[in-house]
């Protein structure tokens, strides 16, 4: 990557980020990509991105289903991850390690995340902000649904201030 653009700096981290360490890394980033497989991590990353107004490119895959979205609170109408999946809601935690995931699906979702991140960094095209892109890996069909901001959201709504 440095050969293509010497101004790009990629810093790989081989550690679990929590608390202050997570906050510091999110604050220093231009774009955050979340590829985690559990809600508590996704919510922690979302809170840090919301706090520091950093765009979050979220991707997930389980069994034969995948999803990608961008949560960019620099845009006033953009929802955050918590607007879509409220923390503390009785959402069934289904982990890849237990349920499995169709291996090519992770590559497809990851590629879509990379494309969204590059568009955000380059400032080109239309991001997935405000939309959730869903992939049915068995039918090999993509569909997009509109996402709305939750006015009662405890992370990005008026109650969060």
Label each residue range with its predicted role.
Residues 1-161:
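Adenine nucleotide-associated cytosolic modules
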């Amino acid at each position: 990557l440095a050969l293509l653009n010497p101004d790009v700096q990629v810093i790989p981290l081989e550690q679990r980020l929590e608390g202050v360490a997570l906050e510091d890394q999110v604050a220093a980033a231009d774009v955050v990509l979340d590829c985690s497989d559990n809600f508590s991590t996704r919510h922690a990353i979302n809170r840090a991105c919301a706090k520091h107004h950093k765009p979050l490119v979220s991707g997930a895959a389980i069994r034969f289903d995948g999803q990608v979205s961008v949560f960019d609170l620099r845009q006033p109408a953009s929802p955050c991850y918590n607007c879509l999946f409220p923390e503390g809601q009785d959402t069934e935690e289904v982990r890849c390690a237990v349920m499995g995931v169709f291996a090519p699906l992770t590559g497809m979702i990851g590629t879509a995340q990379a494309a969204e991140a590059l568009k955000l960094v380059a400032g080109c095209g239309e991001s997935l902000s405000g939309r959730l892109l869903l992939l049915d890996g068995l039918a090999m069909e993509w569909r997009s649904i509109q996402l709305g901001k939750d006015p009662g959201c405890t992370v990005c709504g008026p109650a969060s201030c």
